[in-house]
């Protein structure tokens, strides 16, 4: 059996109850807010992020994870007997974490030239729970002892559909119609829906359950990285075929 560590960051918005079920390393994303360095999940939670969110939002200067943090996890993986590490990145390529994770890999190889630890980066190209669902998929396979090549193949083949609420003023019926149309067209393995109000999110989840024929696996609050375009009561829901 292959032993693979799965690493991601708090930008994936995985709910704590799901994280607890699997052996996933969740790294705290660092925010430079008004020249203060704060760590998501340590210095603030999803709930109180809105209390520290400055106005204007341009006071948030950077969102990152230092290369040293990744490097520490790689060393820990090797010392704990892991043969492989998969770092699942959230967001687009311009997120600083993509660069610092690669820097950490280069540093690890330079410092440990005889190490057999294999480290792979998987770019989910998705934000929030759309990346989180892929993390869970990888974690399940890793727990079963699946080889790293098979896990990477599964990640590349996974279909994720993100259905995001339209502009302000969009009626609930319009929001539902657009979500249902996308789900029918794509038939994704996973579907992620967002609504600005809890009431709408729950109602939308119930309607889509009827449409899809299976219930959502979770409802969750958006994390800090997703909060820029969401209201305080924003909620999202996830379906799995």
What residue ranges belong to the model's regions?
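Short catalytic-loop micro-motif centered on adjacent basic/acidic residues
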Residues: 6-7, 61, 87, 121, ...
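N-terminal glycine-rich anion-binding loop in soluble enzyme alpha/beta folds
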Residues: 5-69
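Glycine-rich phosphate- or other oxyanion-binding loops that anchor nucleotides, phosphorylated ligands
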Residues: 57-58, 64-106
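Mixed-charge interfacial surface used for oligomerization/domain docking
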Residues: 3, 11-30, 36, 75, ...
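Local beta-strand N-terminus motif with an aromatic residue
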Residues: 3-4, 82
